[in-house]
Amino acid sequence: MDTAEIRSRFLNHFARRGHTVVPSASLVAQDPTLLLVNAGMVPFKPYFLGDLPAPWPRAASVQKCVRTVDIENVGHTARHASFFQMCGNFSFGDYFKAEAIPFAFELLTEGFGFKADDLWATVYLDDDEAEGIWRKLLPAERIQRRGKEDNFWSMGVPGPCGPCSEIYFDRGCAYGREGGPIADEERYLEVWNLVFMQYERGEGAGYDYPIERELPARNIDTGMGLERMATILQGVDNLYEIDISRPVLDAAGRLTGRRYGADPADDVRLRVIADHTRTAAMLISDGVVPSNEGRGYVLRRMLRRAIRNARLLGAHEPVMSELFAVVGSAMGTIYPELLDNAETITGVAVAEEQAFAETLRTGTTIFDTAARQARSLGSTTLGGEAAFKLHDTYGFPIDLTLEMAAEAGLSVDEAGFRRLMDRQRQAAKADRAARRIGNVDLSAFRPILARSGPTTFTGYEELSRTSGVVGLVGIADGAGLAAAGEDTEVGVVLDATPFYAESGGQEPDLGRLRFDGGEVEVLDVQRPVPDLVLHRVRVLGGELRLGVEVFAEVDADRRRAVSRSHTATHLVHTAFRRALGEGATQAGSLNSPGRLRFDFHALGAVPPSVLADVEDEINEVALRDLPVRAFVTTQEEARRLGAMALFGEKYGDAVRVVDVGDYARELCGGTHVASSAQLGAVKLLSEASISAGTRRVEGLVGLDAFRYLAREHLLVSQLSTALKARPDELVDRVTDIVGRLRDAERELERLRAAAVLAGAGALAEGAEEVAGVAVVTAEVPAGTAPDDVRLLALDVRGRLAGRPAVVAVAKADGSSIVVVTDDAARGRGLRAGDLVRQSWASLGGKGGGKPDVAQGGGGNPQLVPAVFARLRGLVAEHASR
């Protein structure tokens, strides 16, 4: 069974059971805590957490996923892959264990043809409910209980959690010892995990956390690895050899002159090439491009590992273009974007291969030299300096150096490497502002400093002033200029400026510089070197010359909006420390007009109630109209006064302290409002994790907060009018409507089923006698639910008890058919699965099944009469033998 068919059967199985089929989301995660989607449930996370109402009660999907935490195992084991597809069915407060377990079991046994005797199940230690359901499907000896580590699931943070049940396939005694999954997970292969979200967990590390309560709405989240299922159903040894992976594996062998299966060491490298090429193609198709950070670095690492392994196997020419073409051919049916955007996708990979070729050649030479030197000194460790040089000079990622060192029998002084990297980061921090505005040559600023001295910042006291132009530099190359004409961008240094340069998370001031005969727009303000302020400007008119006087004027409205955000951030910082403890210190911030972003240290999510309390406290402080005061003092005195200093920041002997009344006191060089009342209002919008131990809250300040609240009020007002309810009644009213709608849908389904089954007696009475077999063929309306088609066929068969019977019920549009037979008919060779294959499938549809019940799909209205005629012919043929 090819992978596309497995995928189709999975989705069709759940579509017939009322699930909405949801297309795969992009690999680029919308979740701020993730770089890439790494599990099938990630796109549904907001619904499970209750952040958003689920658009459907039931859903099914095949989600693209990338997981790189164990990338070193890729190629070495039969199971590890960096890209995989996760089949999942989900329920959002609709069905639970009693339905989820049979749904999975039916697909495995009826849809995929697993023998029930080969299946095992595990349940959580005290999950009697799940075991009771499984006992109706499997004997007790093939159901095992396991502890929290194996059979209890949570997201790793406070929120939904619950027991899970895993389904295993017994591959046979050739793969290991008997005893079930507890004894040997090499022999007993996990094929499906069913998670029952029924509890809410509290804070705690690892598996040590309390269960706070049972959830009011219980959810289902399941995961069945498509590649793993294909490995089993296609009878191959590992997931690299299935139909969508093997072509890439063979292409890698052909391009490197190595035959897969001839040498175990070569096989590992070929599998790495095949795996990483597929992953890279999928990432690029979702818009990821190679870079040195984030998901771009994941892609770059994949491509470079694949390229290096190809070179090690003997490929002297570029290989990415052909490998990506093979990936497109193998997977383009499922993911047409691989074919539609083939030129762009391949172009990204080829460009990276070309860029890395010289890096790999030179870097490998440097590595080999360093390795020889280490051995000549009797060392088994590659120095941190050598690893840093490879990274800094030749673009070798440290993980590649570690991999090469391990292959050479060496370790790497990682601590030394990290020290040198930290030193470089500190140096880079000093010139990051200059690089942002385009200048990378800091030497251009030294003569300006020597000639004119430091820039005097006057922006705390004034928003405009007359200043002299003491420096002009080109943005592209940093070269000194004498003049700049209209519509050009240049860097301007003034002897004194009211413009605040970006620093401490506060965005820079913008505005204008006016001079005799012209004007420039200030686009950005940075400190490329200490004591010097550089204004990136665009000349709007006239010619700006070195030495002229300009009238520098800050955009006052923007400055006030940014200052409101900065003062609000101080209040947010203090409020979180008061609510969560002294450890909730600032990890970063961004203060822009009307909006703030505040990162802080915390072990887990902030409960919504605490977030609401923090917001209330901030607005209460704002209403107190506390004076905001800034003063300069010594570090020692600031510490004595209890001023908060930000971790990782460096301060001089003289520091600036900002007070907000008696509520907040911090070391800060930013601009602020004069009193807390000038904030207007603060609205916190979101809180989420951005990394382990670090949370991020975002909010609106001032007019932006008021506008947001006004929109929310309007929305509530419109909902109140539409639902004829007061605002405080809306939740109950919506809950009631949703409940009644669900009840109505169920009643409608019941009535539809009753209407269909009402004709069962007449159909049985009208059975046609064919060679001693009662044959019933019936069409039902196209809108009939799949389950009702099946129920009607079974009901008619039951009414024909005592006679050999074959019953076929098809939907009028040809989208599905169900054929059932009884024991007597099967005794005469009439098996339902064979009848479907020899009638429905032979005439253009698809289908099959068990001897007693089988079904088909993918037909058309014209197919139905022909199939019924063919069925009667098959009955006559078999029964008369």
From Swiss-Prot:
- Top-rank taxon of the source lineage equals Bacteria
Q: Cofactor: bound how, per the entry note? A: Binds 1 zinc ion per subunit.
**Record's SMART domains?**
tRNA_SAD
Enzyme class, spelled out: ligase
Q: Which GO terms describe its molecular function?
A: alanine-tRNA ligase activity; aminoacyl-tRNA deacylase activity; ATP binding; tRNA binding; zinc ion binding
Instruction: Name the positions where Zn(2+) binds.
Output: 566, 570, 668, 672
- Pfam families reported in the protein's UniProt record: DHHA1 (PF02272), tRNA-synt_2c (PF01411), tRNA_SAD (PF07973)
Gene Ontology biological-process entries? alanyl-tRNA aminoacylation
The subcellular location is: Cytoplasm
State a GO cellular component annotated for this protein: cytosol
| E.C. numbers | 6.1.1.7
Query: Which reactions appear under catalytic activity for this entry?
Result: tRNA(Ala) + L-alanine + ATP = L-alanyl-tRNA(Ala) + AMP + diphosphate
Cofactors demanded by this protein = Zn(2+)
Gene3D superfamilies, A to Z: 2.40.30.130, 3.10.310.40, 3.30.54.20, 6.10.250.550, Bira Bifunctional Protein, Domain 2, Threonyl-trna Synthetase, Chain A, domain 2
Q: Which InterPro entries match?
A: aa-tRNA-synth_II/BPL/LPL, Ala-tRNA-lgiase_IIc, Ala-tRNA-ligase_IIc_anticod-bd, Ala-tRNA-synth_IIc_core, Ala-tRNA-synth_IIc_N, Ala-tRNA_ligase, Ala_tRNA_ligase_euk/bac, DHHA1_dom
Q: Which UniProt keywords apply?
A: Aminoacyl-tRNA synthetase, ATP-binding, Cytoplasm, Ligase, Metal-binding, Nucleotide-binding, Protein biosynthesis, RNA-binding, tRNA-binding, Zinc
Q: What is known of its domains?
A: Consists of three domains; the N-terminal catalytic domain, the editing domain and the C-terminal C-Ala domain. The editing domain removes incorrectly charged amino acids, while the C-Ala domain, along with tRNA(Ala), serves as a bridge to cooperatively bring together the editing and aminoacylation centers thus stimulating deacylation of misacylated tRNAs.
Query: Which PANTHER family does this chain map to?
Result: ALANINE--TRNA LIGASE, CYTOPLASMIC, ALANYL-TRNA SYNTHETASE
**The protein's role, per its UniProt record:** Catalyzes the attachment of alanine to tRNA(Ala) in a two-step reaction: alanine is first activated by ATP to form Ala-AMP and then transferred to the acceptor end of tRNA(Ala). Also edits incorrectly charged Ser-tRNA(Ala) and Gly-tRNA(Ala) via its editing domain.
Which family is this sequence assigned to? Answer: Belongs to the class-II aminoacyl-tRNA synthetase family.
Q: What is this protein called?
A: Alanine--tRNA ligase
